Swiss-Prot record:
Coiled coil: 63-167
Gene expressing this chain: Bloc1s6
Record's compositionally biased regions (Pro residues): 1-10
Cellular location(s): Cytoplasm; Membrane
Name of the protein in its database record: Biogenesis of lysosome-related organelles complex 1 subunit 6
Keyword Cytoplasm appears in the UniProt entry: yes
Region (Disordered) residue spans: 1-37, 141-172
InterPro entries registered for this protein in UniProt: BLOC-1_pallidin, Snapin/Pallidin/Snn1
Domain of life where this protein originates: Eukaryota
Basic and acidic residues biased stretches: 143-164
Recorded GO MF terms: actin filament binding; molecular adaptor activity; protein homodimerization activity
Main location: cytoplasm
Described function: Component of the BLOC-1 complex, a complex that is required for normal biogenesis of lysosome-related organelles (LRO), such as platelet dense granules and melanosomes. In concert with the AP-3 complex, the BLOC-1 complex is required to target membrane protein cargos into vesicles assembled at cell bodies for delivery into neurites and nerve terminals. The BLOC-1 complex, in association with SNARE proteins, is also proposed to be involved in neurite extension. May play a role in intracellular vesicle trafficking, particularly in the vesicle-docking and fusion process.
Keyword Phosphoprotein belongs to the record: yes
C-alpha cells in the first residue's frame, strides 16, 4: 500500500517531464489565487444559496443566541459585582473614617484630662494666692499697728521728756 503524496504547489511540476525542467510553471495553470474565476465558472442557484444560508443559520444560530444570553448574564453579573464592590469600598472608607474619629476622640480625652489637671492646678494656685494675700494684709495691718504704737510711744516719751525738763518758775 502506498501513501499518496501531497499535491504540488500551484503551477510547479515536481516530477520528470519531457519538455519542462523541474520547478518550471505548468502551462495552463495560473499563479493567481485559486478562488479567482469561480463565480464565472459555476452557475449559482439562488434557491440553493438560500438553503445553504438557512442551514448555516439553523446550525449556528442557537449556539450564538446561547452565547449572547450567557454574555448578557455575565455582563449583568459584572454590573452587580461592581456595585457590590463599590458598596464594600464605601464601607471600608466609613470604617477608616470611624478609625479617624476614634483617634480624634482618644486625642480629645487626652486633652480633656490635661485641661482638668490644669484647672485643678489653677484652683490650687488661686487658693494659695488668696491665702498669701490675706497673710500679706494681716502682716501689713500688724506693721501699721506696730508703727502706730511706736509713734504713740515716741510721742509719750517726748511729752514725758518735755514735762521732765526744768521749767522756769513763774515770778509772782
Amino acid at each position: 500500500m502506498s501513501v499518496p503524496e501531497p499535491p504540488p504547489p500551484d503551477g510547479v511540476l515536481t516530477g520528470p517531464s519531457d519538455s519542462l525542467e523541474a520547478g518550471e510553471p505548468t502551462p495552463g495553470l495560473s499563479d493567481t489565487s485559486p478562488d479567482e474565476g469561480l463565480i464565472e465558472d459555476f452557475p449559482v442557484d439562488d434557491r440553493a444559496v438560500e438553503h445553504l444560508v438557512g442551514g448555516l443559520l439553523s446550525h449556528y444560530l442557537p449556539d450564538l443566541q446561547r452565547s449572547k444570553r450567557a454574555l448578557q448574564e455575565l455582563t449583568q453579573n459584572q454590573v452587580v459585582l461592581l456595585d457590590t464592590l463599590e458598596q464594600e469600598i464605601s464601607k471600608f472608607k466609613e470604617c477608616h473614617s470611624m478609625l479617624d474619629i476614634n483617634a480624634l476622640f482618644t486625642e480629645a480625652k487626652h486633652y480633656h484630662a490635661k485641661l482638668v489637671t490644669i484647672r485643678k492646678e489653677m484652683l490650687l494656685l488661686h487658693e494659695k494666692t488668696s491665702k498669701l494675700k490675706k497673710r500679706a494684709l494681716k502682716l501689713q495691718q500688724k506693721r501699721q499697728r506696730e508703727e502706730l504704737e511706736r509713734e504713740q510711744q515716741r510721742e509719750k516719751e517726748f511729752e514725758r521728756e518735755k514735762q521732765l525738763t526744768a521749767k522756769p518758775a513763774k515770778r509772782t
